[in-house]
């Protein structure tokens, strides 16, 4: 019974296996009032009356400290990157060959799917460790308890990268600039703050920004507009698109059961956990999906929001280029594709392909990733 209770708690309180349902509680951003309070404190406003020890004050102070820390790392990057580039040897091996990557994931998590899409498209070999969503013993080494987690070994240096967007930005910066990964990840420092519910949340500075010099940025993007566009839509995928997944795949009891059947088949569950997850999890997530629908202010028919989001993306890509990145996918293409891919095989995905204009772009993305030079992925079988 204790294990059943533990499983039910995980399914109700955590987020990510196709959802906001199998990992940790959804991140709640600071409200406009909290941010306004931070602005007054940062500006030294004497009229700001805030109670001592208030969670909002603590959040604002943490946010201010995090912002200052991010600025410090950005300035330091400009100085240090010039030295690192000067030290580069023209005879060095391709950077991707010097990395050994291990991805800790839930296969059905949209954030993990984003990272896999990036790694596959860039032909970066990696080992996959599927995490048991109940016990999570595979990531007991980490104080950061969300997935994806990427462990990267570069020579004698072993680094842990957290947060899907940070992982992608850091690796892309590493591939383009040639800076040591150990140095690159310092440009994305974590910061902690209190949200309006009084709970501590962790965010990362610069998470959508690639740390490139002007020449590298020009070669990669061709102009500031393309860089800004990529960042905007990467953030849109995280802040909006991903929140449409759970309400759509758990829309009805039948869809919820089909979704958890898929999660159990693709995930790492013990026999008892699998049975509990399929039926208890489906029932729990059907109910939770209604709460998520209200939280994110979705329409009565959540499919409409999904179709509108897909069509909004297609409109942004436009008719004159196959991808937002032009002739090849950029990081925004990979993010949107990675999020949507977790619905494959489910009714919501089939409806999306039929009732929106996204299918041609989606099929182009599939081909682009399939045509990338093949890499060898190792998925070790771990016994429960």
Curated annotation (Swiss-Prot):
Induction pattern: Constitutively expressed. Not induced during tissue inflammation. Down-regulated in the absence of PTGES.
Catalytic activity: prostaglandin H2 = prostaglandin E2; prostaglandin H2 = (12S)-hydroxy-(5Z,8E,10E)-heptadecatrienoate + malonaldehyde
Coiled coil: none
Membrane topology: Single-pass membrane protein
Residue ranges that the UniProt entry lists as topological domain Lumenal: 1-56
Binding site for glutathione: 147, 163-164
Topological region Cytoplasmic: 74-384
Tissue expression remark: Widely expressed. Expressed in brain, heart, liver, colon and lung.
Subunit architecture: Homodimer. Interacts with EXOSC10. May interact with CEBPB.
Protein name: Prostaglandin E synthase 2
Source organism (scientific name): Mus musculus (Mouse)
């Amino acid at each position: 019974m204790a294990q059943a209770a533990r499983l039910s708690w995980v399914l109700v309180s955590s987020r990510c296996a196709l959802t906001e349902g199998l990992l940790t509680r959804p991140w709640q951003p600071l409200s406009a009032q909290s941010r306004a309070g931070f602005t007054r404190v940062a500006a030294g406003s004497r009229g700001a009356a805030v109670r001592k020890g208030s969670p909002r004050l603590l959040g604002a102070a943490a946010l201010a400290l995090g912002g200052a820390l991010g600025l410090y790392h950005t300035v330091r990057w400009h100085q240090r990157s010039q030295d690192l580039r000067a030290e580069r040897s023209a005879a060095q091996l391709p950077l991707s060959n010097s990395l050994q990557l291990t991805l800790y994931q839930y296969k059905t998590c949209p954030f993990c799917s984003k990272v896999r899409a990036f790694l596959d498209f860039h032909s970066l070999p990696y080992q996959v460790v599927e995490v048991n969503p109940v016990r999570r013993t595979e990531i007991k080494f980490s104080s950061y308890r969300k997935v994806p987690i990427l462990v990267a070994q570069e020579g004698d240096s072993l680094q842990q990268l957290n947060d899907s967007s940070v992982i992608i930005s850091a690796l892309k910066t590493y591939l383009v600039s040639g800076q040591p990964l150990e140095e690159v990840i310092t440009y994305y420092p974590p910061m902690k703050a209190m949200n309006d519910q009084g709970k501590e949340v962790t965010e990362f500075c610069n998470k959508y920004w690639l740390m490139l010099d002007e020449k590298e940025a020009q070669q990669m993007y061709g102009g500031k507009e393309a860089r800004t566009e990529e960042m905007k839509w990467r953030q849109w995928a995280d802040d909006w698109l991903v929140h449409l997944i759970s309400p759509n795949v758990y829309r009805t009891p039948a869809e919820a059961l089909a979704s958890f059947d898929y999660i159990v088949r693709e995930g790492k569950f013990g026999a008892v956990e699998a049975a509990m997850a399929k039926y208890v999890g489906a029932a729990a997530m059907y109910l939770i999906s209604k709460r998520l629908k209200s939280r994110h202010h979705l329409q009565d028919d959540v499919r409409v929001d999904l179709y509108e989001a897909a069509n909004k993306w297609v409109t942004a890509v436009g008719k004159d280029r196959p991808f937002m990145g032009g002739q090849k996918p950029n990081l925004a293409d990979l993010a949107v594709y990675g999020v949507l891919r977790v619905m494959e095989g489910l009714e919501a995905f089939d409806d999306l392909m039929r009732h929106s204009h996204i299918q041609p772009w989606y099929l182009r993305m599939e081909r682009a990733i399939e045509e990338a030079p093949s890499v060898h992925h190792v998925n070790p079988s771990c016994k429960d």
